[in-house]
């Protein structure tokens, strides 16, 4: 595919800690249920999986927030559980319940049968990447993503989201050998999956370690970060003549920033509990930082949104040799008023231009 020249590469340059005229912004879950147009497309698709597995629908919803807002990146519309679904675990989205697996990994035999899926079974994802790149026509970069080996293992063992992670933590303490096997398969599958996204046209990739923060210190390094590092180490880092930056986001991972920064990634995503300035001091500008507004700020009205945006930018401080991509500290709430996002994007761009000019 001969890709259109990138018209706005501020996001990619910020991830690589290169000079930029303003702080770029995109939002986790920016294509989602807070947008009426997303809900209309999902209704046409019939279900979440009907949306995610149809490249044209996936492209349509990926591009919707960019039609509304002056965002600096698009992120592929998909789900972190597509990989275990391709492994045969039977993903289903029950109304009001979230994702669940029909065949979770509970026994030694279940784990023994687990294998890296044929990437052709995920062709719909790579086709969506190609369609989105074509339709973006170089407007902004496209981010590909996957769940971290640990985070998808949580769903694969629990069978659904969990409050206490009892089943996977039972396996971790009682049969760590089984969990390590799951994580090894997940790491290989995730690496192949992200590299296929890059080959299809993703210009940056992000690993979502959404549940890394539920692990005890020491166990996080052993069961989450070690496998994240394996994925990052194998990523294609140059494609179509450009560096492909890698972002790692561990929700609740603030105490491990130094270790995460050393995993080989270009940028760390931060949740809203972390002070950006302190995170920057602790990582010494070795990586860019992404984040980290509390998503609930978007319910506070124009004045609060703009004040918190400025506070977040000020916390990072003068960019200098660092890199900052503005984002939320977690995914945007489905109840967010769409006009709140317009206020946020405007304030980040306007205020950061003045900061970058200093």
From Swiss-Prot:
Biological processes, Gene Ontology terms: protoporphyrinogen IX biosynthetic process from glutamate
Record flagged with keyword Lipoprotein: no
Residues that coordinate or bind substrate: 29-33, 79, 155, 210, 330
Reaction(s) catalysed (UniProt annotation): uroporphyrinogen III + 4 H(+) = coproporphyrinogen III + 4 CO2
Principal subcellular localisation of the protein: cytoplasm
Compartment list: Cytoplasm
Associated pathway: Porphyrin-containing compound metabolism; protoporphyrin-IX biosynthesis; coproporphyrinogen-III from 5-aminolevulinate: step 4/4
E.C. number(s) listed in UniProt: 4.1.1.37
Keyword Cytoplasm part of the UniProt annotation: yes
Any one annotated GO CC term: cytosol
Keywords per UniProt: Cytoplasm, Decarboxylase, Lyase, Porphyrin biosynthesis
Pfam family, one: URO-D
GO MF term (any one): uroporphyrinogen decarboxylase activity
Site, Transition state stabilizer: residue positions: 79
Function: Catalyzes the decarboxylation of four acetate groups of uroporphyrinogen-III to yield coproporphyrinogen-III.
Assigned protein family: Belongs to the uroporphyrinogen decarboxylase family.
Record note on quaternary structure: Homodimer.
Name of the protein in its database record: Uroporphyrinogen decarboxylase
Native source species: Bordetella petrii (strain ATCC BAA-461 / DSM 12804 / CCUG 43448)
Gene name as annotated: hemE
């Amino acid at each position: 595919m001969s890709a259109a020249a990138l018209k706005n590469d501020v996001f990619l340059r910020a991830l690589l800690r290169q000079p930029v005229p303003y702080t770029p912004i995109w939002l986790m879950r920016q294509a989602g249920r807070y947008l009426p147009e997303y809900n209309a497309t999902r209704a046409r698709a019939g279900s979440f999986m009907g949306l995610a597995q149809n490249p044209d629908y996936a492209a349509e919803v990926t591009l919707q927030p960019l039609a509304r807002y002056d965002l600096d990146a698009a992120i592929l519309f998909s789900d972190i559980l597509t990989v275990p679904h391709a492994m045969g675990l039977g993903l289903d989205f029950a109304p009001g319940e979230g994702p669940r697996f029909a065949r979770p990994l509970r026994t030694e035999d279940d784990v023994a049968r687990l294998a890296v899926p044929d990437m052709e079974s995920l062709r719909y994802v790579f086709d969506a990447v190609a369609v989105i790149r074509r339709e973006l026509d170089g407007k902004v970069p496209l981010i590909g993503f996957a769940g971290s080996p640990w985070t998808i293992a949580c769903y694969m063992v629990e069978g659904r989201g969990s409050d206490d992670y009892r089943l996977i933590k039972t396996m971790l303490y009682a049969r760590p050998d089984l969990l390590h096997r799951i994580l090894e398969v997940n790491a290989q599958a995730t690496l192949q999956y992200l590299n296929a996204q890059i080959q299809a046209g993703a210009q940056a990739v992000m690993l979502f370690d959404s549940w890394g923060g539920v692990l005890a210190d020491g166990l996080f390094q052993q069961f989450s970060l070690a496998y994240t590092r394996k994925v990052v180490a194998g990523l294609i880092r140059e494609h179509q003549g450009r560096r492909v930056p890698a972002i790692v986001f561990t929700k609740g991972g603030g105490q491990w920033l130094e270790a995460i920064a050393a995993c080989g990634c270009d940028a760390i995503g931060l949740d809203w509990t972390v002070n950006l300035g302190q995170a920057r001091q602790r990582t010494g500008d070795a990586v860019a930082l992404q984040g980290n507004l509390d998503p609930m700020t978007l319910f506070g009205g124009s004045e609060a949104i703009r004040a918190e945006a400025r506070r977040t930018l000020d916390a990072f401080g003068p960019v200098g040799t660092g890199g900052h991509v503005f984002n939320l500290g977690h995914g945007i709430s489905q109840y967010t008023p769409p006009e709140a996002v317009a206020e946020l994007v405007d304030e980040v761009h306007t205020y950061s231009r003045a900061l970058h000019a200093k």
